[in-house]
Amino acid sequence: MPQTTDEAASVSTVADIKPRSRDVTDGLEKAAARGMLRAVGMDDEDFAKPQIGVASSWNEITPCNLSLDRLANAVKEGVFSAGGYPLEFGTISVSDGISMGHEGMHFSLVSREVIADSVEVVMQAERLDGSVLLAGCDKSLPGMLMAAARLDLAAVFLYAGSILPGRAKLSDGSERDVTIIDAFEAVGACSRGLMSRADVDAIERAICPGEGACGGMYTANTMASAAEALGMSLPGSAAPPATDRRRDGFARRSGQAVVELLRRGITARDILTKEAFENAIAVVMAFGGSTNAVLHLLAIAHEANVALSLQDFSRIGSGVPHLADVKPFGRHVMSDVDHIGGVPVVMKALLDAGLLHGDCLTVTGHTMAENLAAITPPDPDGKVLRALANPIHPSGGITILHGSLAPEGAVVKTAGFDSDVFEGTARVFDGERAALDALEDGTITVGDAVVIRYEGPKGGPGMREMLAITGAIKGAGLGKDVLLLTDGRFSGGTTGLCVGHIAPEAVDGGPIALLRNGDRIRLDVAGRVLDVLADPAEFASRQQDFSPPPPRYTTGVLSKYVKLVSSAAVGAVCG
């Protein structure tokens, strides 16, 4: 029977489910390639199937990634069941918790670029048709999403899941839930004589009771929530703990989903639109998530060729209330978010208030609004997640600053702030170690504005996280009385008066490089302003004496990184 016009049109628009792997499976000249693939398990009938890369950052160095080998196997089951052929490969992951506070932290942010690059290299070289990207640690999540955006193939992201809280029994007989951030704060308390060494040891032994990423709304959980809001992971998949076997189901369905995306011709950039990034920003703001989300969402948007800027964070943050009472400043952890319905609870509340774009496409092949209608998440419980009518703060948990000290911008986590204005006296340190020494010596006091510079993307290099110093400041009882400013960045576990991502950075001659001990600094959160209170002419004259220090690394990956990396104001991207 002849085809109707509609039938012919339908056939002509069916996507090629092997848009790339034909390069290695089809034709006489591909005999050698097929021979290699036969050696890893493929048979004649498999060469007609789409080849799906299962990219995993599994390793044995950190609990964040331990579940990924199990989940990768479930993903492969899903790919097989949907008619695809999975091929697993690995990439690196750096543990921020282990690399914090020493030279190793220089290598953390660059690992994001290495992950994205390595996934791109394998996907391009082997001509894989689509991917499921598995990650558990802070930089591996954005690294995988950057790769997906750059490649613009069918792709689904899958999170390893968070760790459950530990339970520490202290010397006074009390017990409390603890996360890794408690260890950093305990060090500061112990150094000031506010906690015994025995209690530090008890906390150390309890903070990581098993596998999974750090349990509060720190960077990994923030980015997992953002990935779900972007539409790049299955709805409801961000919150379940790593040990929860629901994750195996999400893994299998992720494998099935990527094959269906191939059949429908849906690629990552069809999902990663400007509106999708606005949804992710809104969810991060409502959760009071990590300031690292600013850096990472800018970088993912760059790879997706989406124009995203700090101004977008300011605009959205001013209209989205902060709803989640979660650590590091609140009482709850990600498993508590899971217990009350997960990320979809926040998304539905924001969608109902007109604060999300419900028509954004997701990896299910449906829109975000359609996904939420299908799973019918409950309303906020009022404890872990507040209703919009009763927010913790009327605006989002992250604020973008500008001013004479940050002409290109800076970022402050305002979730947990008690006041809007802080004015203090500059204590200037070139690097984190000098500031830690001063704190341990007791020379940092109430009213100080501690400036840690030459820690930016180029100057660090690597834009180290300052959790060692912020945790020590809080542990020393100075968390609400000392302002910390840096061209570096902060851990998702940071709380207190902390301004990071100051741009331009010191090594580029930004105003932070010109600060001197005794300068007065003013932070106005409500006004979104960060200023040095100095005579403008006198302050500008200091530029004549500025000379950047020599590079810390002249060989290796960081030497390359310094030559390529851009300002934190645009995501610290390379190219």
Curated annotation (Swiss-Prot):
Mg(2+) binds at D96, D138, K139, E465. Its cofactor is [2Fe-2S] cluster; Mg(2+). InterPro entries: DHAD_IlvD/Edd (IPR050165), Dihydro-acid_dehy_C (IPR042096), DihydroxyA_deHydtase (IPR004404), DiOHA_6PGluconate_deHydtase_CS (IPR020558), ILV_EDD_C (IPR056740), ILV_EDD_N (IPR000581), IlvD/EDD_N (IPR037237). Binds 1 [2Fe-2S] cluster per subunit. This cluster acts as a Lewis acid cofactor. The keyword Lyase applies. Keywords: 2Fe-2S, Acetylation, Amino-acid biosynthesis, Branched-chain amino acid biosynthesis, Iron, Iron-sulfur, Lyase, Magnesium, Metal-binding. It is an enzyme of class 4 (lyase). SUPFAM superfamilies: IlvD/EDD N-terminal domain-like (SSF143975), LeuD/IlvD-like (SSF52016). Its EC number is 4.2.1.9. The modification N6-carboxylysine is found at K139. Pathway: Amino-acid biosynthesis; L-isoleucine biosynthesis; L-isoleucine from 2-oxobutanoate: step 3/4; Amino-acid biosynthesis; L-valine biosynthesis; L-valine from pyruvate: step 3/4. It comes from the Bacteria. GO terms for biological process: branched-chain amino acid biosynthetic process; isoleucine biosynthetic process; L-valine biosynthetic process. GO terms for molecular function: 2 iron, 2 sulfur cluster binding; dihydroxy-acid dehydratase activity; magnesium ion binding. The keyword Transcription regulation does not apply. [2Fe-2S] cluster binds at C64, C137, C214. One of its GO terms (cellular component) is plasma membrane. Belongs to the IlvD/Edd family. Functions in the biosynthesis of branched-chain amino acids. Catalyzes the dehydration of (2R,3R)-2,3-dihydroxy-3-methylpentanoate (2,3-dihydroxy-3-methylvalerate) into 2-oxo-3-methylpentanoate (2-oxo-3-methylvalerate) and of (2R)-2,3-dihydroxy-3-methylbutanoate (2,3-dihydroxyisovalerate) into 2-oxo-3-methylbutanoate (2-oxoisovalerate), the penultimate precursor to L-isoleucine and L-valine, respectively. Is specific for the (R) isomer of 2,3-dihydroxy-3-methylbutanoate, with no catalytic activity against the (S) isomer. This is Dihydroxy-acid dehydratase.
